[in-house]
């Protein structure tokens, strides 16, 4: 029999989940955490011991996914965790989106059915293993009773229970009805990691075949009988409202069904998308632009810089920072990051059918239950009368943590008696986003004997959590905005972090892939390179001297130095830059090699990343997420910026909010460290590693210490600091 160790449900809930909780947002633990072995589904003809597993009498194994799939590989990894402990036949595993239900499928960290913060595997690692092990134990018990033997004499493997002494076997499908009658055990045995069969193997993704053959259904793919199409124009100025609408020309166009006017937007419903689009273009709209019509990016930065001079709320303070900064070689710098849009390949959309007594929604969202509750308010219905059908997301990146597109679609659909698919154009999507905030991170440090003796860090910027999850905003501190500032990996004896809340004039802000560490990691790692130069030390050796209490971080840094060829001679104007970071309970070190020509153009030559993510459930997914995250972050560093003029976003599509292209992408090598530690998060780690590593490569190649993104090529050509 496989070796196992016993873990009680109480230990999982009070120990495992609480630990995962602290690794995320450090939020107060909710009163009623998820108990994954309940409830059972008593539908005849299948074995459904808990909310996650369904096995019918043919052996078909359906796993219910509490997290959403938006390209990050979660469906495959979560399925592997369940199937590992269930000892399922991987070839028979299918996945389904779980319906909205916080009690059954609420993320154990947040208490909400939400996907984000590189949290899926971390949050569900123990609960889903327990759910799978519980189901396996019930199947084994059913077989043992049928054979008249002890359960301990039976083994489970690949969807079968076997009794070696007699040579008998029964498939899970054959045992489904009998197992359904078993009482779920209170304590279950989960596998010793040494006995893993699926976890740790490079598994092919379960969603790939349907994405290749076109069967995969995204939110935008929903098609219903009698459905019409709509598109919208929102007030171009944030906070503005609809004034007058002349729809006389629009309603005469073939296929145009209705013009719907809301407070801040106008929609045209048509028989098809083209009719809706042409109808919208034919409208004459006068906007009441409101008080924000003259706001510019310059105004926003002036406000932020002024706010950053205030004393902030103290998030962490160790040692005597004033004394430390009064001695040694002093260093001061401020690092600034711009607004960024999400620009998912699938623009925001929702299909809605509102009836007098019910509302049904088809979309792709990262937060199903919030969508359900907000849609209920918009429809004027009880929550239990709202059905949310969630589909694959064509990119989320935090944008689909917001319910605004569904709220608008419900309000539009209330005006008619048929289902309506509402699709925002790329232009409307980019110009009416909830943007990654502008941030200003100030660092004051002192050097004594070649090491940092004092480190004072002040973050100024938007408090996204104050809006999105108010209980997390306490004592004037947004714990997301200072996440990697308080969790810097280095041994700083005198360490002080402050936060100043500064909301940008009129511009809505939200989470963006990488969340709080976006700004923190960039500032910390850029400052460390500048301090290394000030101390006359190699950047990697400088970091190593202050990582002695962080062995996992030290190990990946050593490996990346070796694998990247750190220290080997480079041609003129070619540099290597490094970034190290603890990231969502993972540890990643990255080296970017880049060439900068005489006019400031940048060529990425090579990227090397070493990541210790604990037990890598699917190493292929880890590599893919680091590769994709690096390109996502480097795109922002090279090109990403949303600017405001006269209260309007100036960018509109990929021609002026551009993405990195294939010919610009260098060779990327990702090394996944084998580890027995609990899994860390991986979906966002690469995003935050790329920008500072590139900036430090530029610094090494040119001596130009850039302190603002996106990278200004003119400054590189001129050889100036910015």
Model-derived regions, located:
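Cofactor-binding beta-sheet edge motifs in enzyme active sites
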Residues: 2-25, 32-722
């Amino acid at each position: 029999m496989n070796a196992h160790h016993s873990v009680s449900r109480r230990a999982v809930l009070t120990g495992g989940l609480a630990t995962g909780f602290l690794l995320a947002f450090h939020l107060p633990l909710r009163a009623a955490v998820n108990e994954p072995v309940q409830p059972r589904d008593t539908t005849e003809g299948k074995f459904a011991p808990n909310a996650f597993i369904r096995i019918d009498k043919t052996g078909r194994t359906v796993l219910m996914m509490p997290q959403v799939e938006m390209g990050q590989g979660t469906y495959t990894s979560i399925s592997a965790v369940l199937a590992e402990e269930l000892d399922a036949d991987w070839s028979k595993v299918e996945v389904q989106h779980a319906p909205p239900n916080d009690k059954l499928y609420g993320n154990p960290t947040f208490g909400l059915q939400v996907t984000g913060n590189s949290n899926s595997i971390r949050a569900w690692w123990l609960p889903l293993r327990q759910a799978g092990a519980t189901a396996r134990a019930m199947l084994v018990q059913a077989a043992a009773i049928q054979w008249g033997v002890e359960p301990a004499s039976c083994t489970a493997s690949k969807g079968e229970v076997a009794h070696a002494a007699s040579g008998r076997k029964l498939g899970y499908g054959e045992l489904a009805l009998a197992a359904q009658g078993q009482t779920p055990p209170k304590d279950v045995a989960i596998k010793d990691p040494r006995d893993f069969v699926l976890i740790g193997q490079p598994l092919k993704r379960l969603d790939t075949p349907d994405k290749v053959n076109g069967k995969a259904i995204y939110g935008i793919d929903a098609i219903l009988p009698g459905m019409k199409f709509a598109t919208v124009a929102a007030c171009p100025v944030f906070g503005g409202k609809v004034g007058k609408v002349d729809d006389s020309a629009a309603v005469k166009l073939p296929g145009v069904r209705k013009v719907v006017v809301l407070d801040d937007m106008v929609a045209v419903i048509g028989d098809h998308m083209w009719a809706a689009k042409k109808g919208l273009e034919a409208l004459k709209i006068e906007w009441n632009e409101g008080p924000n019509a003259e706001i510019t990016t310059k105004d926003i930065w002036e406000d932020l810089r002024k706010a950053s001079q205030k004393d902030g709320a103290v998030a962490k303070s160790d040692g005597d920072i004033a004394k430390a900064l009064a001695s040694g070689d002093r260093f001061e710098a401020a690092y600034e990051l711009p607004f960024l849009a999400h620009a998912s390949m699938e623009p925001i959309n929702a299909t809605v059918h509102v009836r007098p007594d019910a509302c049904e929604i088809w979309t792709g969202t990262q937060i199903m239950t919030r969508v359900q509750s907000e849609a209920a308010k918009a429809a004027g219905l009880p929550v239990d009368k709202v059905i949310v059908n969630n589909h694959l997301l064509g990119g989320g990146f935090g944008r689909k943590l917001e319910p605004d597109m569904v709220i608008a679609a419900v309000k539009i659909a209330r005006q008619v008696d048929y289902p309506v698919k509402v699709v925002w154009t790329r232009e409307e999507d980019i110009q009416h986003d909830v943007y990654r905030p502008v941030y200003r991170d100030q660092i004051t440090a002192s050097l004594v004997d070649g090491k940092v003796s004092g480190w004072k860090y002040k973050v100024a910027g938007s408090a996204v959590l104050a809006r999105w999850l108010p209980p997390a905003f306490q004592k004037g501190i947004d714990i997301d905005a200072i996440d990697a500032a308080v969790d810097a990996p280095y041994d700083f004896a005198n360490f002080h972090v402050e936060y100043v809340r500064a909301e940008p004039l009129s511009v809505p802000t939200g989470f963006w892939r990488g969340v709080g560490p976006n700004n923190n990691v960039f500032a910390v790692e850029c400052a460390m390179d500048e301090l290394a130069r000030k101390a006359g030390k190699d950047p990697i050796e400088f970091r190593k001297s202050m990582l002695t209490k962080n062995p996992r971080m030290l190990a990946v840094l050593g490996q990346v130095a070796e694998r990247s060829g750190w220290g080997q001679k480079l041609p003129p104007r070619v540099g290597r830059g490094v970034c190290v970071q603890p990231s969502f309970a993972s540890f990643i070190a990255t080296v970017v090699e880049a060439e900068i020509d005489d006019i400031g153009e940048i060529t990425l030559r090579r990227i090397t990343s070493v990541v210790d993510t604990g037990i890598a459930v699917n190493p292929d997914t880890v590599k893919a997420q680091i590769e994709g995250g690096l390109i996502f972050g480097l795109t922002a560093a090279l090109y990403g910026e949303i600017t405001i003029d006269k209260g309007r976003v100036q960018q509109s599509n990929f021609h002026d909010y551009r993405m990195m292209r294939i010919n610009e992408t260098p060779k990327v090598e990702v090394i996944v460290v084998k580890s027995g530690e609990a899994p860390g998060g991986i979906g966002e780690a690469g995003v935050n590693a790329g920008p500072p590593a590139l900036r430090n490569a530029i610094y090494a190649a040119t001596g130009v210490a850039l302190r603002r993104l996106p990278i200004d090529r003119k400054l590189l050509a001129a050889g100036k600091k910015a």
